[in-house]
Amino acid sequence: MAWTSLILSLLALCSGASSQAVVTQESALTTSPGGTVILTCRSSTGAVTTSNYANWIQEKPDHLFTGLIGGTSNRAPGVPVRFSGSLIGDKAALTITGAQTEDDAMYFCALWFRNHFVFGGGTKVTVLG
């Protein structure tokens, strides 16, 4: 439930926020069952750091949102270990290791800038199977 509250808070904070920062993600990625896929999240302001508290949120086709990762690398309770968050170079990353067909979804990154989060446009992950 705490993660649901976090997601709702993030959406509320970001809905009216204006920022010069732009967060970009790959528009789409494809993998096979059992494969590994790495999603990245880039900031227009420079390198993403732990101070950006990267969050990763999954949206299933039925519009069910699930918080996966908070604070760059902290997996939410109940989230499978195949999901991991990290920094790779100057970007935040979400790695899905051993992808399953149920991981076919949209994934959104949100980065913290001073006093609000800025969301990326989302990455559609397709798991062929």
From Swiss-Prot:
GO biological process, one term: immune response
Keyword Signal part of the UniProt annotation: yes
CC annotations in GO: immunoglobulin complex
Gene3D superfamilies: Immunoglobulins
Residue numbers carrying Pyrrolidone carboxylic acid: 20
Superkingdom classification of source: Eukaryota
One protein family per Pfam: V-set
PROSITE patterns in the record: IG_LIKE (PS50835)
InterPro entries with a match to the protein in the record: Ig-like_dom, Ig-like_dom_sf, Ig-like_fold, Ig_sub, Ig_V-set, IgV_Light_Chain
Signal peptide (UniProt feature, chain positions): 1-19
Miscellaneous comment: This chain is from a myeloma protein with anti-DNP activity.
Annotated ranges, domain Ig-like: 20-125
Protein name: Ig lambda-2 chain V region MOPC 315
Keyword set includes Lipoprotein: no
Keywords: Adaptive immunity, Immunity, Immunoglobulin, Pyrrolidone carboxylic acid, Signal
